[in-house]
From Swiss-Prot:
CDD domains assigned: S1_EF-P_repeat_1 (cd04470), S1_EF-P_repeat_2 (cd05794)
InterPro entries (UniProt xref): Elong-fact-P_C (IPR015365), NA-bd_OB-fold (IPR012340), Rib_uL2_dom2 (IPR014722), Transl_elong_fac_P/YeiP (IPR020599), Transl_elong_KOW-like (IPR013185), Transl_elong_P/YeiP_cen (IPR001059), Transl_elongation_fac_P (IPR011768), Translation_prot_SH3-like_sf (IPR008991)
This protein's encoding gene: efp
Function recorded in the entry: Involved in peptide bond synthesis. Stimulates efficient translation and peptide-bond synthesis on native or reconstituted 70S ribosomes in vitro. Probably functions indirectly by altering the affinity of the ribosome for aminoacyl-tRNA, thus increasing their reactivity as acceptors for peptidyl transferase.
GO CC, one annotated term: cytoplasm
Keyword Protein biosynthesis: yes
Lineage of the species this protein comes from: Bacteria, Pseudomonadati, Pseudomonadota, Gammaproteobacteria, Pseudomonadales
Pfam family name, one: Elong-fact-P_C
Pathway as given in its UniProt record: Protein biosynthesis; polypeptide chain elongation
Location relative to the cell: Cytoplasm
Record protein name field: Elongation factor P
HAMAP family: EF_P (MF_00141)
């Protein structure tokens, strides 16, 4: 057991029998009252978010989640099936993949990480940087070029992203999966 003050951002705590990711933790100590920790939490099972205040010495149980490398095997409607190197398959619904869904597409070769809680897969994490192909974009508006000019582009799976003005149809681009931002042009994956 750790105290609330010892828990760090991006660690996972077991609260009421469910794993919660600590997205933000702010320690505050006032002169008269005891120290407190304000936390922004995300439930890893259902995706709900909450903000809670704990006393700095409240006990919390840290959780170590198991992770395993997987690849997307196939998509069947709202079901996404991933397979590990031992050919075990793991099926997840679209709502379980909400944060990474815009970057998942049929036939992708990115090595992902399945996240397990108590032997059950609860989500999949993509690599920090992925490569995708632009299937549609328009010409950038000329004239307003005092800063970085961005224009909308559509990826193969229908996701729209802002890209640099020089990106054309069929170009391959790098995307940061943490915030969905365009990083630059690149070569097609081998």
């Amino acid at each position: 057991m750790k105290t609330a003050q010892e828990m760090r951002v991006n660690s996972v705590a077991l609260i009421d029998g469910q794993p919660w990711l600590i997205q933000k933790a702010e320690f505050t100590k006032s002169g008269r009252n005891s120290a407190i920790v304000k936390m922004k939490l995300k439930n890893l099972l259902n995706g709900s978010k909450t903000e809670t205040v704990y006393k700095a010495d409240d006990k919390m149980e840290p959780v170590i989640l198991e992770r395993k490398e997987v690849n997307l095997s196939y998509i069947s409607g709202e079901d996404y099936v991933f397979m590990d190197p031992e050919y075990n398959s793991y099926e997840l619904r679209a709502e379980d993949l909400e944060s990474v869904l815009p970057f998942i597409e049929e036939g992708m070769t990115d090595v992902c990480e399945a996240v397990f809680f108590e032997g059950k897969v609860i989500s999949v994490d993509l690599p920090t940087t992925i490569v995708r192909q632009v299937v549609y974009t328009e010409n950038a508006a000329r004239g307003d070029t005092s800063g970085k000019v961005m224009k909308p582009a559509k990826l193969r799976n229908g996701t729209e992203i802002k890209v640099a003005e020089f990106v054309d149809i069929d170009d391959w681009i790098e995307i940061d999966t943490r915030d969905g931002s365009y990083k630059g042009r690149t070569q097609a994956p081998a």
